[in-house]
């Protein structure tokens, strides 16, 4: 059990309650501010610049001109209220500034003041405000209480994307010298060493060698975990969490078993040993592109034919939606395969071809449900049919175990609730927010558990898996009840002479 918290933990009940509005319940919550070294490594000022108000207003204008969608989102809200009870952070904290419309308004009120005629001449009439230190403080607090999950945009009749507003606000804050330590420090590690953990090549090689020994000892089969192998067919780009921690590492073992049994040559790159791209979270195109280009460089250097992403939600969004724009064209890869592919797509295709033999009885000790990760569910897809991001993972799970049960329909698929730790919030300085933000998913898990006695919840996102490992004990679940989809695959896979 985790250390007793210094905050009230929401209680699970028979159904998810919409809380009564309580002002400023999370006004104390904010992440650590980035140090000078973390800011400057990303091309941002090391501290708050002297003329920060003018710099921020100018940056806001630049972003609305550059990203027309952002301007539409700031102009088009009609205050219908459809989004108010859709945010997991509002449901878990009751703070009205965690309603999506109120979160948007923190930026919208400044936009109106400086970039609309009504706001310039009649600010009080249209809710426009000057950019002051108090407003900047609210930005820093509440734009770091948004996991950019985009659930609110599903229910907005105008499709307003609060995630885009949040990203813009964070980019403005970085530009004036007030960035978030957690995200910016991690991006700096990727720029320097190629992964979020700051693992150098020797440490990565030692880790993979140890995994080979562990798998051979357990199975009697030599399953390779290749590193920097030139001429391999597949470049696997996976979250660095897969290299060091449970339950992630069991997913990596599952990938390796799949590649081994299918007879696919593959490799990891020490230059691009990270699928995650936190540049997305801070709204920085330049930093997002710099991270993505490492993947292109590795693919060219190693001469691979395919790029496959591991189990990471936002990494798959960047890969599926933006990789070609950021780092393309990828005309040097095999045109027979999409660029990139998700490991679930690869495994699903191999199962359909009959190239993998699975024994679902190997997982008969498990009764499994599945958490749809936000960036997979609402910002990408899989396969060649609409909704593949929902069906493919479930079909892979059902091929690997006999006891699978979905959570309630309003909490999965396109309507899935966030884990509570995405969007650059997976840091212990925001643990209260993370625990409270997990409430809707924990309620859904309780509901399916009450009916079907669930033992495990599977996910295909490194952030989700890390988040649930942390918050499960707060709600009476065991931290080891969260597992990787490819742990199920790996445990069910019958190893032998590969094809």
Task: Give short role names for the model-derived ranges.
Residues 343, 349-398:
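C-terminal amphipathic alpha-helical segment
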Residues 85-113, 154-173, 381-384, 424-438, ...:
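Iron-sulfur (Fe-S) cluster-binding segments and ferredoxin-like electron-carrier domains
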Residues 58, 64-74, 104, 108-326, ...:
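Iron-sulfur-cluster electron-transfer modules
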Residues 1-142:
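Ferredoxin-type iron-sulfur electron-transfer modules and their immediate structural context
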Residues 159, 243-333, 377-388, 392-399, ...:
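Cofactor-cradling patches in redox/metallo enzymes
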Residues 233-243, 366-377, 458:
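Short hydrophobic beta-strand segments
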Residues 77-83, 87, 146-152, 156, ...:
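Short cysteine clusters
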Residues 174, 295, 325-333, 347-363:
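Extracytoplasmic substrate-binding proteins
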């Amino acid at each position: 059990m985790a250390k007793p918290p210094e905050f009230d933990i929401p209680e699970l009940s028979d159904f998810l309650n919409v809380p009564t509005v309580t002002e400023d319940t999370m006004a104390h919550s904010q992440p650590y501010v980035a140090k000078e070294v973390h800011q400057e490594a990303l091309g941002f000022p090391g501290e708050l610049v002297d003329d920060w108000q003018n710099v921020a207003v100018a940056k806001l204008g630049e972003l609305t001109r550059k990203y027309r969608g952002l301007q539409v989102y700031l102009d088009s809200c009609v205050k219908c209220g459809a989004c108010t009870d859709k945010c997991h952070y509002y449901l878990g904290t009751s703070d009205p500034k965690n309603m999506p419309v109120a979160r948007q308004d923190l930026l919208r009120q400044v936009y109106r003041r400086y970039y609309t005629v009504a706001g310039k001449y009649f600010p009080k009439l249209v809710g426009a405000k000057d950019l002051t230190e108090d407003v900047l403080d609210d930005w820093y607090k509440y734009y770091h209480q948004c996991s950019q999950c985009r659930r609110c945009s599903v229910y907005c009749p105008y499709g307003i994307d609060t995630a885009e507003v949040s990203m813009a606000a964070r980019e403005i804050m970085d530009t004036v010298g007030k960035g978030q330590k957690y995200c910016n420090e991690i991006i700096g590690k990727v720029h320097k060493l190629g992964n979020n953990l700051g693992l150098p090549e020797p440490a990565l090689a030692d880790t993979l060698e140890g995994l080979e020994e562990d798998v051979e000892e357990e199975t009697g089969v030599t399953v390779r975990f290749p590193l920097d192998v030139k001429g391999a067919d597949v470049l696997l780009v996976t979250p660095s969490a897969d290299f060091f921690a449970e339950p992630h590492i069991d997913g990596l073992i599952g990938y390796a078993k799949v590649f081994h049994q299918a007879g696919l040559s593959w490799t990891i790159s020490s230059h691009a040993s990270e699928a995650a791209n936190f540049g997305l979270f801070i709204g920085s195109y330049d930093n997002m592109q710099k991270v993505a280009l490492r993947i292109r460089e590795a693919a060219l250097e190693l001469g691979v034919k395919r790029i496959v992403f591991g189990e990471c939600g936002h990494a798959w969004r960047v890969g599926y939606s933006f990789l070609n724009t950021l780092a393309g064209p990828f005309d040097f890869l095999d045109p027979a395969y999409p660029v990139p592919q998700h490991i679930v797509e690869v495994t699903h295709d191999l199962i359909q071809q009959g190239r993998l033999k699975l024994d679902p009885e190997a997982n008969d000790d498990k009764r499994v449900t599945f958490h749809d990760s936000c960036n997979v569910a609402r910002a990408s897809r899989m396969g060649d049919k609409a909704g593949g991001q929902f069906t493919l993972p479930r079909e892979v799970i059902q091929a690997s175990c006999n006891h699978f049960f979905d959570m309630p329909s309003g909490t999965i698929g396109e309507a899935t609730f966030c884990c509570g730790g995405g969007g650059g919030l997976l840091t212990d300085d925001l643990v209260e927010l993370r625990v409270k933000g997990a409430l809707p998913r924990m309620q859904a898990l309780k509901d399916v558990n009450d009916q079907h006695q669930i033992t495990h919840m599977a996910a295909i996102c490194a952030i989700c898996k890390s988040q649930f490992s942390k918050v499960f004990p707060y709600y009476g679940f065991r931290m080891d009840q969260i597992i990787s989809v490819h742990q199920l695959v790996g445990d069910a896979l019958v190893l032998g002479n590969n094809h």
